[in-house]
């Protein structure tokens, strides 16, 4: 080897790009103990506060008592328990599709679904800011990958015109972009998919449970639920559990069950996770879920308005993901460290997750955040930002 792992690690450290894991003690509530210090948690995807909700915990406990701790096998062997079927039926009803299929994670879903749908001779159109799991799914598929400028539907149209003679065409996008907090223009994308005879897949990991009148996500918010061919979403963010799903027509789901390698060759999700997910979907699809979404929306508006009033650039965020632009990697991580020392944990984001020069704090709001805590966080950020010359 030309370079040792130790040498490469030293290079990452010199570039300000070395990462380490911080230890969280206790549950993922609005406050947590981070590396032994209590802090306001502003970087969890537990948007509705369901990760420590008693209904989910009780459902998981009951499932362990009845079904044990493991599914014991992959889904196509003996690993399909009745809870898998019940959860998939519930997700299909929730998303308004013919069927659904549960995967072990969002990464497993995208890296399995996309190569199952397209291959050599096909083309996949992918937003340049799509999640890494979508990019990897496209690469694994061996289809021609065409990346279009972020949310630029005019540029996308030109690219689709160039590939009209391709085999199967797949248009894939995040519903909510995880690092910027903005949304895909799903109405325009749906029109393009109709015009060019493409399939439209939406990864709504950060919209499911949060957006739309009933929490069905960004497609519901934009009025195009029926236009999406493959709804992908996760169970471990707003829904407070673990895993992911695809929701689509019965034929597409049957096809994925037979072709998606990440589904076929993995031991399936355990009973506790399935039961917690079922409880989460029921809760989201209820008046209690609506109340949580309203609280999250209020917290998000309060926090974003406070940052903007202080002079921060929130990078066009439209959702509960609110980035705070800093710029350089070292400055961003210094900002994070100063905040944590003062009792606020907002994770700095650096390359390769975001392009160089666009490093930011990625703040994520919860329904369970208290307004006074958010006000204190904004004041701290403003003081640190002024001291560092960010604002």
From Swiss-Prot:
Q: Which annotated residues bind substrate?
A: 19, 131, 353
Xref: InterPro entries? Aminotrans_II_pyridoxalP_BS, Aminotransferase_I/II_large, AON_synthase_class-II, AONS_Archaea/Proteobacteria, AONS_Proteobacteria, PyrdxlP-dep_Trfase, PyrdxlP-dep_Trfase_major, PyrdxlP-dep_Trfase_small
Catalyzes what? Answer: 6-carboxyhexanoyl-[ACP] + L-alanine + H(+) = (8S)-8-amino-7-oxononanoate + holo-[ACP] + CO2
Q: Name one Pfam family in it.
A: Aminotran_1_2
Listed cofactors: pyridoxal 5'-phosphate
User: What are the BP-aspect GO terms?
Assistant: biotin biosynthetic process
* One Gene Ontology term of the molecular function aspect: pyridoxal phosphate binding
Q: Where does pyridoxal 5'-phosphate bind?
A: 106-107, 178, 206, 234
- EC code: 2.3.1.47
**Pathway involvement?**
Cofactor biosynthesis; biotin biosynthesis
Which family does the entry's similarity section mention? Answer: Belongs to the class-II pyridoxal-phosphate-dependent aminotransferase family. BioF subfamily.
**In UniProt terms, what function does this protein have?**
Catalyzes the decarboxylative condensation of pimeloyl-[acyl-carrier protein] and L-alanine to produce 8-amino-7-oxononanoate (AON), [acyl-carrier protein], and carbon dioxide.
Name of the molecule in the record: 8-amino-7-oxononanoate synthase
GN (gene name): bioF
């Amino acid at each position: 080897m030309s370079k040792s792992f130790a040498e490469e690690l030293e290079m990452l450290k010199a570039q300000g790009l070395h990462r380490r894991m911080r230890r969280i003690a206790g549950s993922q509530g609005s406050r947590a103990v981070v590396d032994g210090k209590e802090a306001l948690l502003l970087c969890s995807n537990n948007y509705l506060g369901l990760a420590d909700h008693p209904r989910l915990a009780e459902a998981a406990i009951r499932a362990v008592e009845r079904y044990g701790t493991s599914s014991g096998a992959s889904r196509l062997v003996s690993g399909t328990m009745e809870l898998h079927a019940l959860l998939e039926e519930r997700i299909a009803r929730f998303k308004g599709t013919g069927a659904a299929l549960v995967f072990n994670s969002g990464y497993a879903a995208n890296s399995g679904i996309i190569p199952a749908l397209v291959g050599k001779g096909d083309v996949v159109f992918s937003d340049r800011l799509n999640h890494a799991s979508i990019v990897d799914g496209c690469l694994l598929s061996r289809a021609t990958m065409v990346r279009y400028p972020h949310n630029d539907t005019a540029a996308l149209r030109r690219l689709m015109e160039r590939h009209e003679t391709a085999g199967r065409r797949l248009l894939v996008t995040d519903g909510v972009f995880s690092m910027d907090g903005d949304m895909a223009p799903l109405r325009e994308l749906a029109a393009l998919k109709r015009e060019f005879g493409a399939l439209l897949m939406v990864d709504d990991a950060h919209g499911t449970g949060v957006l739309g009148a009933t929490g069905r996500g960004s497609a519901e918010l934009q009025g195009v639920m029926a236009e999406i061919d493959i709804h992908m979403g996760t169970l471990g963010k707003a829904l407070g559990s673990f895993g992911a799903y695809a929701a689509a027509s019965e034929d597409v789901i049957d096809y994925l069950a037979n072709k998606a390698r990440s589904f076929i060759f993995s031991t399936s999700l355990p009973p506790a996770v399935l039961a917690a997910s079922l409880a989460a979907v029921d809760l989201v699809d209820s008046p209690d879920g609506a109340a949580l979404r309203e609280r999250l929306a209020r917290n998000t508006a309060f926090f974003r308005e406070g940052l903007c009033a202080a002079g921060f650039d929130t990078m066009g965020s439209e959702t509960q993901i609110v980035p705070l632009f800093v710029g350089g990697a070292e400055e961003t991580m210094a900002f994070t460290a100063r905040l944590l020392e003062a009792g606020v944990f907002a994770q700095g984001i650096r390359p390769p997750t975001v392009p160089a020069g666009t490093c930011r704090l990625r703040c994520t709001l919860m329904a369970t955040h208290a307004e006074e805590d958010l006000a204190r966080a904004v004041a701290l950020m403003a003081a640190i930002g002024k001291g560092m010359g960010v604002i």
